[in-house]
């Protein structure tokens, strides 16, 4: 006798909601009927939500994620490719959306954890080193010291568009919808249609290299070596404000909501209120250049050439914690709601909590740690000697080393399935690693 037949559907759903995903799978193997009972979006949505995986079905659908089509290097048959076998003739209904997402994300995270990835052929075409990168998940746009802008099809590993016209090194790229915005060492900002790679208009006003940009709604905020920030209202191509406050070159920028933080060689940070077009506060305390910064709307985190990180209060303004431990300059940082990760010239990555305590010291790099990316599941660090490492930052342990990274790197872009880096060497190359 099947006891399930005697349970009200609401009670059965309630009972099943207490099962773990492994228990659900075991339950579903008993018979076709039990498999159908567990093949419900409500059950698997719960497990995706509990693990923080809703973004895979809401912000983007991993069920539509495709594999790269080009012939890729895959040593040892350690393929990351996902294949869900479904018999051609079956009595079973199709796997429901959120169960499919759960299975795929579990496979994806296992790829990152086990080091299962494929390496695309190097993207070659730039005559000089690549100095700027942007990606929308399907295409890559790169800028170079050779003054050209290129678009690459990741699936085919080919350059599909090229734009000349910049008069100097391309320093920064923002990609928003069908619009590309480039900052250039020729002091200009260019707005480009990404669909046909044509120049829409340019913005003139800076008197130095435009090295940093961020979008705040329809307002573009740019920072240049002329030590100013400028606000541009893009719909009517208008300069709406000029901010002055730093007394030396601006080294880093980070935005959140309607506020922008900048760090400078003058050893200070400034929080700017873009909505009200004013300087909110200047933060002083570092003894060397502020190399990197982060802002979440409530607090600022900064790293410096003085080897320290600092956490700053917004209200009342001031330094709440000094994070000491690195034995070399702090080159980069990445943060989320739980922790701060910092990379240094001392070859280590440190994990800190927001009370200023160092939780883990991650060792494995040789030379400077130049790039960091953090998400809920992992931390990725890139540094000298072609070395990229994937960490479980919660436990403070190394998941794997990307042994087949093909080139040196100084820029890194990471999403859920791809790892993209640019080399500081000439001629410029871009490397693509796929974990899917």
Label every PLM stretch briefly.
Residues 1-5, 22, 28-29, 33-151, ...:
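Intrinsically disordered, low-complexity acidic/Ser/Thr/Pro-rich linker and tail segments
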Residues 51, 123-130, 164-170, 204-210, ...:
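WD40/WD-repeat beta-propeller blade N-cap
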Residues 118-121, 158-161, 198-201, 238-241, ...:
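A structural motif specific to WD40 beta-propellers
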Residues 143-146, 183-186, 223-226, 263-266, ...:
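Conserved strand-to-loop turn within each blade of WD40 beta-propeller repeats
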Residues 149-153, 173, 189-193, 213, ...:
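WD40-repeat beta-propellers
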Residues 207-209, 213-312, 321:
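Solenoidal tandem-repeat scaffolds enriched in leucines and small polar residues
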Residues 381-436:
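C-terminal interaction modules of eukaryotic adaptor/scaffold proteins
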């Amino acid at each position: 006798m099947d006891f399930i037949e005697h349970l009200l559907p609401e009670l059965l759903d309630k009972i099943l909601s207490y099962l773990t995903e492994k228990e659900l799978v075991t339950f579903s193997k008993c018979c076709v009927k039990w498999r159908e009972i567990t093949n419900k979006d409500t059950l698997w949505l719960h497990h995706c939500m509990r693990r923080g995986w809703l973004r895979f079905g809401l912000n983007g659908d991993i069920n539509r994620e495709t594999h790269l089509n080009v012939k890729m290097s895959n040593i040892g048959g350690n393929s990351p490719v996902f294949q869900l076998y479904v018999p051609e003739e079956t009595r079973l209904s199709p796997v429901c959306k959120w169960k499919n997402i759960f299975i795929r994300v579990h496979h994806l995270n296992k790829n990152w954890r086990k080091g299962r990835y494929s390496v695309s052929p190097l993207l070659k075409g730039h005559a000089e080193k690549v100095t700027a990168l942007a990606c929308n998940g399907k295409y890559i746009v790169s800028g170079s010291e050779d003054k050209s802008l290129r678009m690459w099809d990741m699936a085919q590993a080919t350059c599909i568009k090229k734009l000349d016209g910049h008069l100097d090194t391309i320093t920064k790229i923002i990609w928003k919808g069908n619009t590309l915005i480039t900052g250039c060492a020729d002091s200009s900002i260019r707005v480009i249609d990404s669909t046909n790679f044509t120049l829409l208009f340019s913005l003139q006003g800076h008197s130095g290299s435009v090295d940093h940009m961020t979008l705040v709604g329809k307002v573009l905020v740019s920072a240049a070596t002329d030590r100013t920030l400028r606000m541009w209202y893009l719909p009517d191509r208008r300069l709406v404000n000029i901010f002055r406050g730093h007394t030396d070159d601006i080294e880093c920028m980070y935005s959140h909501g309607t506020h922008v933080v900048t760090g400078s060689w003058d050893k200070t940070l400034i929080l700017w209120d873009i909505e009200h077009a004013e300087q909110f506060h200047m933060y002083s305390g570092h003894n060397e250049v502020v190399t990197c910064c982060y802002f979440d709307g409530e607090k600022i985190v900064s790293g410096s050439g003085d080897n320290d990180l600092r956490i700053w209060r917004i209200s009342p303004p001031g330094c709440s914690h000094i994070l000491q431990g690195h034995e070399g300059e702090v080159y980069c940082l990445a943060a989320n709601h739980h922790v701060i990760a910092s990379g240094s010239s001392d070859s280590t990555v440190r994990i800190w909590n927001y009370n200023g305590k160092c939780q883990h010291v991650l060792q494995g790099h040789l030379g400077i740690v130049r790039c960091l990316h953090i998400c809920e599941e992992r931390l990725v660090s890139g540094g000298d000697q072609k070395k990229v490492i994937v960490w479980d930052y919660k436990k403070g342990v190394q998941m794997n080393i990307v042994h087949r990274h093909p080139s040196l790197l100084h820029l890194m872009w990471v999403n859920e399935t791809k790892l993209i880096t640019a080399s500081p060497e000439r001629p410029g190359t871009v490397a693509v690693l796929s974990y899917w």
